Curated annotation (Swiss-Prot):
Role this protein plays: Catalyzes the rearrangement of 1-deoxy-D-xylulose 5-phosphate (DXP) to produce the thiazole phosphate moiety of thiamine. Sulfur is provided by the thiocarboxylate moiety of the carrier protein ThiS. In vitro, sulfur can be provided by H(2)S.
Subcellular location: Cytoplasm
Binding partners and assembly: Homotetramer. Forms heterodimers with either ThiH or ThiS.
Family matches, as Pfam families: ThiG
The protein's name: Thiazole synthase
Length: 275
């Protein structure tokens, strides 16, 4: 990925702090939906991401397409984010989270306590259960997990999850895998403005411009899987998503000009040539 001259103020971008870890990249990626492991590995590398999420249940059960998945990634280079995808209740999510922590340890990340919390009883729209998510989050925080909960763009729920000790909040941009982009910008903006933990826009981002849009709003990071894995050229799309995420963050930090209802000339009026 293209680097920025260290003399530029943009190079002072602060690191992303989640739990006890710091990260340079603000793009998180996934491991699902790739045609093969080699494409997945190359895409992860091209994206420049440092956090990669893995569905614990699918790895544990050797679901089709997931056999050998955990071993296919070089976990010395990226941080594993186990997730509870497929869990329909809080109790199930807590059990799977514990398995995820053990899986991370077995793969060499002894101090990895991260868990992406997903409680999704709805198999059609894949919308997260707010009550089950809150219940599971409270228990997992008590057990020492750094909880990254996947939620609807609900500012009140986001604040409550922050209050119980979650390490981030992860509001969806639009339904998982839909590629619809950011459909609830107003609520996500409220979440960003009121959060004291990182806000990660997760799900629905379909293009680099949408990744940049999320970052320009002030999101701390984005998580993108389907848009990369199912692109015609996943490796190239991963590169584009990494660049867009970085560009969006720089744009947010640099401060865009205000929107005006009238024109403002770029050139001074003084010294005009008149007839």
């Amino acid at each position: 990925m293209q680097t920025i001259d260290s003399s530029s103020s943009a190079a002072t971008t602060e690191t992303l702090q989640i739990g006890h870890r710091q990260f340079q990249s603000r793009l998180m990626t996934g491991t699902g939906k790739y045609d093969d492991f080699e494409t997945m590995r190359r895409s992860i590398a091209a994206s420049g991401c440092e956090i990669v999420t893995v569905a614990v249940r699918r790895v544990q059960t050797n679901a089709p397409g997931h056999q050998g998945l955990a071993e296919a990634v070089d976990w010395n280079k990226v941080w594993m984010l186990p997730n509870t995808a497929g869990c329909q209740t809080a109790e199930e999510a807590v059990r799977v989270a514990r398995l995820g922590r053990e899986m991370a340890k077995l793969l060499g990340q002894e101090d990895n306590n991260f868990i992406k919390l997903e409680v999704i009883p709805d198999s059609k729209y894949l919308l997260p259960d707010p009550i089950g998510t809150l219940e599971a989050a409270e228990q997992l925080v008590k057990e020492g997990f750094a909880v990254l909960p996947y939620i609807n763009a609900d500012p009140l729920l986001a604040k409550r999850l922050e209050e119980v000790g979650c390490a981030t909040v992860m509001p969806l941009g639009s339904p998982i895998g839909s590629g619809q982009g950011i459909k609830n910008m107003a609520n996500i903006q409220i979440i960003i403005e009121n959060a004291t933990v990182p806000v990660v826009v997760d799900a629905g981002i379909g293009s680099p411009s949408e990744a940049a849009q999320a970052m320009e709003m002030g999101a701390d990071a984005v998580l993108i899987n389907t848009a990369i894995a199912k692109a015609q050229d996943p490796v190239m799309m991963a590169t584009a998503m990494g660049m867009a995420t970085q560009a969006g963050r720089f744009a947010y930090q640099s401060g865009r000009i205000p929107v005006k209802a009238y024109a403002s000339a770029s050139s001074p009026l003084a010294g005009r040539i008149s007839s």
